[in-house]
Amino acid sequence: DNAGLNKKQNTDIAPQPMVLIGLGTIAANNAANPNTFATDLNFLVWGDNNGDMSDTDGELTINFNGGSGMTTVVDTPTRTWKIIENGGDIGSTRIAIPTSSLSGLPTPTSNDAYVMVIADDEGFSTNVETVFLTTSGANQIADYDFDGVKFFTFGVAKLNTGSLQITLDG
């Protein structure tokens, strides 16, 4: 941008690299990221609460919208991140976390999955979304478009089954 801050991807570094966020993609380094900001002075700022990455022994219950009555339970760490989008819409970002950073959580079984949980509040009770992570090398990755102020964390979503009723017309 015109301020000379053209940081298209960044990671935290203490005590070890944890979350890496890139504009559109994650490249070998900032200069190699081919994406550009649509508007000058657009940026994301994020930080974490320095919480532990081990399982909290508390579970986050997520209700799915649409009146299905379905829920899932997610084991989460105490570490959460706050991210602020400033200056307008940044667009889609790619988020990566080393799989080894999730080792304090329960190991996913064949029906479980690593997820990123996003919400409007630090208690993860308002406008809660989950995004499934996929494995890419030594990382778990997801694409997400952060808008405004959001909180996010990572976890292991447990398979939850239930019956659904379908009414066919005709």
Language-model segment annotations:
Residues 1-71:
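Catalytic cores of secreted or luminal carbohydrate-active enzymes
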Residues 64-114, 120:
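Proteolytic processing hotspots in large secreted/extracellular or virion-associated proteins
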Residues 138-162:
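C-terminal beta-strand-rich structural cap/linker in extracellular carbohydrate-active enzymes
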Residues 34-36, 105-108, 143-145:
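A general structural signal for short secondary-structure junctions and capping/turn motifs
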Residues 44, 95-97, 116, 152-154:
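Generic structural hydrophobic/aromatic packing signal, biased to beta-strands
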Residues 120-125, 158:
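Acidic glycine-/aspartate-rich tracts in secreted/extracellular proteins
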